[in-house]
Amino acid sequence: MKRFKDKVVLVTGAGSGIGRSTALRMDSEGAILIIIDINEDELIKTKSMLKNKESTAKVLDISTIADVKKFFKDLNKLDALINVAGILRFDNSHEVQIDDWKKILNVNLTGTFFMCSYALPLLLKSKGAIVNVSSSAALGSHAWTAAYSASKGGISAFSKTLAVEYGMEGLNVNCVCPASIETPMSTNPNMPKDIDTRLLKKIMPIDGVNRSPNEIASTIAFLASEDAIHINGIDLRVDGGLLT
């Protein structure tokens, strides 16, 4: 399928994990990609995997409004925005440090807000789509993820606001909510000491399998495409039945 032929698609967090898989999926479907990450080395690796020579890569800290504003100043076309960039940390809630709280909220939630805010004029012109990566942590109860869960809950709520506010103008805004996925961010995390291992079962899919980022990328591609034209303002769980 070439659902994104000649479409300009922007993917944040494209240096690894779900972001990289999404970029490769979009590339395979004909998109002209703009891929973004804060990690230049990993971003270059992703860029080297893309077949479309019109695609570009940009190192960008999405949590810095001046940098985001400058980036969008020279952008004149956009058909889809896919916000994947995010960070994760595990702590007992009473031990969360304020600097860690602020950093996670700034990248995950505020960064997503900045990207959407500056992309909106272009997306309204193209009647495009926004897909924000939220999490099953936004919808269920995940231990040790106070800041992360708060940030992802905010993304889900913010996305619904955009869907209602701009849906009449032809913009679709949806969230994908993955459960545990095999990515560099979630593999071998630093967990708090002396955790109750029974709580780990509450963040695992029914079959106990951490799926590939490719399975999230295919869902993102669907929501960003015209196949999902009548889907707006949803949290699409890709969680293996975790929250069922």
Residue ranges with predicted function:
Residues 116, 151, 159:
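Active-site helix of classical SDR
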Residues 194-215:
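Catalytic Tyr-x(3-8)-Lys segment
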Residues 15-16:
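Conserved glycine-rich cofactor-binding loop
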Residues 135:
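Residue(s) in the substrate-gating loop at a strand-loop-helix junction
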Residues 121, 164-168, 229:
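Alpha-helical segment proximal to the catalytic Tyr-Lys
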Residues 113, 209-238, 243:
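C-terminal substrate-recognition "lid" of short-chain dehydrogenase/reductases
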Residues 92-93, 97-102, 200-201:
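Substrate-binding pocket helix/loop in short-chain dehydrogenase/reductase
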